[in-house]
Amino acid sequence: MLLAACTVEPLATSSSDSTLSTGLAGQATSEVLSGISVAPVKTRVAQQVRNRLLFAMNGGELKPGGQYEVVLSVSERSQTLAVEGDSLTATAARVIVLVSYDLVDVNTKKVVAAGRRQSVASFDRTPQSFANQRAEREAQDRAAREVAQQLRLAVAQDIASL
């Protein structure tokens, strides 16, 4: 009997009896997410985050007439984690991708929700510069993929609370 007041629902439900709030009554979260656009970005890592987020929200097919837009601000940096004793050569590093987002109502241009998410991916360094560049780029891509999933969940929670 303690669970009688429980209102937990899956975020990706497509059931027609699922409502998110009075403003979005009758629309499942997945339907609302599929109509959200993501503003263009400028850097390679930001583009990776944007592409992954778009695909996670709508499978790459944006429904026209969406009510919301996600505006991303993406920063990325690398940090050395370990160095070789005598030569002080970096042997391990990590990439940190930090994303701030605003969920904007397209009609009123007002920010209805905002947040920050980050992801970290580690990689090994070698004496070969090309291998280091590839390892860092792959770490950036892994971090971008992870933070995009975090953003999808955050935006879904924001939509559900409207």
Pin down the residues of each PLM region.
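Surface-exposed short loop/turn segments
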Residues: 55, 60-67, 71-114, 121-138
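Bacterial signal peptide processing site
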Residues: 7-10
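C-terminal motif of bacterial Sec signal peptides marking the signal peptidase cleavage site
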Residues: 2-5
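Short hydrophobic alpha-helix segments
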Residues: 12, 115-117
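C-terminal/domain-edge helix-coil "capping" segments
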Residues: 134-162
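An acidic helix/loop motif centered on a single conserved Asp/Glu
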Residues: 43-52, 147
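Post-signal peptide N-terminal segment of mature Sec-exported envelope proteins
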Residues: 15-41
